[in-house]
Structures are given as C-alpha cells and as structure tokens.
Curated annotation (Swiss-Prot):
Protein name: Undecaprenyl-diphosphatase
UniProt cross-references to Pfam families, sorted A to Z: BacA
Taxonomic superkingdom: Bacteria
Organism field: Staphylococcus saprophyticus subsp. saprophyticus (strain ATCC 15305 / DSM 20229 / NCIMB 8711 / NCTC 7292 / S-41)
Keyword Transport: no
EC number: 3.6.1.27
InterPro entries to which the protein is assigned, alphabetical: UppP
Location(s), subcellular: Cell membrane
GO BP: any one term: cell wall organization
Topology within the bilayer: Multi-pass membrane protein
C-alpha cells in the first residue's frame, strides 16, 4: 500500500476521532471527507472501505471506554469499588448505575437489531444525511433555548429510570443517518432538565456499550473484507481514531458547559450547506449508499 493511501487512513481516523462523540454527525463528515474527497473505496473497494469505517469507529469507542473507565468500574463493582456499599441491583445508592444504562440501551438495541439493514439500504444517502444534520441542529437549538429556563438542572447521578429510557429513545431516533447520536441524546437530556455536562456524560457512558456491540457485530460480519495487504491502513486509522478520540472527548466535555449546543448546531447547518453545494451544484457524491 502506498504512503499516500496510509496518510488517507490516518486522516480518516482523525476525522472519526474528532466527530464520533461530538454532536456534529460523524456520518456527515465521513461523506464530506471520504466519499466526496479521499474516496477510500477507490483503492480498497466498497466493502473494504465500509469495513475500514467500522474499524476506526471502534477506535473512537475504545477511546470513550477509556475516558469513562472509572464510571464503568464503579457500576460493575470492579477494582477499588468492589468493597463499597451497594443497593439491591449491585450499585451504590443514589448513583448512576448499571440499570440506568441498560434501560437507556433498550430502544436503540431493539430497533438496531430489527432495522439496521433497512436503514443502511434505504436511509443512507447524501440527501437523507443532510436532512438528519439539519433537523438535529434545530433540535439542539430548541434544547439550548429551553435550558435557559431551567433553574436547578440535575446532575448525572440524579437521573431516574424514566429519564434514562427517554434519552435512550432519542438514541434510537438518531439511527437516522446524520442526526447524530450525541446531538440527539444530549439535547434530550437537557430537555429532561439535566445540565449540559451531565447530559453529555450520560450520553457517552450509555453510547459506548451500544456502539461496541453494533460495531463489533458489523466487524464480525465483514471480517472477510480485511486483507493482510491493507492491514497497515486499518491499524493506522484505528490508532488515529483512538488517540484523537481521547483528546476530542475530554475537550468536548470541557467546552460543553461553557458554549452549550448552539455553536455546534450552527456548524452543522454550515456543513449541510457545504455538502448541498457539492452534491447538487457539482454532482459530487452522487450514488453514495451505506455499503
């Protein structure tokens, strides 16, 4: 594999790491950077390029798992948390616990099992991604405006099971390509009277198991498309996504309490305009599908 192609793999890993957990839609950015510019499918083949995107997404997922490892250890009662007082479901009282995460995962898990192939076949196109980007941006703006009326927002350890389920429903809705899982769930958390940082924490903590299961299953189904001659491309992309993902998640969690969601929403609208100009004005990206 040529050096230029390896550099492209690193670039795509960086883009994935920057955007997977930010409320800006990693799908929209992959369309812009890969499908419209770098075009990994031209030197990997369409199925191998699709598999590569699964691999770099896993890099971002592992970054999220690392950032929130202490929370997972606490919920699973592992390590230094194994001797702490627990309640009836194996967790400390009045804390975010494993049942919150399970309840939040149910909607996306069920819909993913039932409709993932349908979504990939019928909803994954440039116009539908642009629709998801735009509607998601409006939802984020609405959430930010509403948050100004909340006088005593909840933190992540005050969330109840009903709120966890509702946020999980919004994660399921975000299966529409371009809508953005984090944009949808953070906005819903804010509408459920959580502060922005806590809504982001819960979003990421809940998203990692869902994404790990979904990406892991997809990778198993597509392992045959990973060729040893391309292994360097996959490894560099994965590492880039993991390292950049670590930095991006920590930076986002610092920024979200200060700038809220509207700046990200405006960015999404600008992204829609750029993609629309390239797609409708210049015909770039015509025929893009999920696989």
């Amino acid at each position: 594999m040529l050096i230029l192609e390896l550099i492209k793999g690193i670039i795509l890993g960086i883009v994935e790491g920057l955007t997977e957990f930010a409320p800006v839609s990693s799908t929209g950015h992959m369309i812009l950077v890969d499908d419209m510019w770098l075009k990994s499918s031209e030197f990997l083949g369409s199925q191998s390029a699709f598999t590569f995107k699964i691999v770099i997404q896993l890099g971002s997922v592992f970054a999220g798992a690392w950032v929130f490892r202490e929370r997972y250890f606490e919920m699973l009662h592992i390590g230094k948390y194994r001797h702490e007082p627990i309640d009836g479901i194996g967790q400390k009282p009045k804390r975010l616990n494993l049942l919150h995460i399970i309840v939040g995962m149910i909607p996306a898990g069920v819909l993913g099992l039932l409709f993932d192939d349908v979504i990939q076949e019928y909803l994954f196109s440039v116009p539908t991604v642009m629709i998801g980007l735009f509607i998601g941006a409006i939802y984020m703006i609405i959430a930010d405006i509403y948050s100004k009326k909340v006088t005593n927002p909840r933190n992540v350890d005050q969330i109840n099971y009903f709120q966890a389920f509702v946020i999980g429903l919004s994660q399921a809705i975000a299966m529409w390509p371009g809508f953005s899982r984090s944009g949808s769930t953070i906005s819903t958390g804010v509408l459920m009277k959580m502060n922005h940082k806590s809504a982001s924490d819960f979003t990421f903590i809940m998203a990692v198991p869902v994404m790990l299961a979904a990406s892991g299953l997809s990778l198993v189904k597509n392992m045959e498309y990973i060729h040893m001659s391309d292994i360097g491309f996959y490894v560099l992309g994965f590492l880039a996504a993991f390292i950049v993902g670590l930095i991006a998640i920590k930076t986002f969690l610092y920024l979200i309490s200060k700038i809220k969601l509207i700046p990200f929403a405006i960015y999404r609208i600008v992204l829609v305009i750029i993609i629309a100009i390239l797609y409708f004005g210049f015909g770039i990206g015509q025929g893009i599908t999920g696989e």
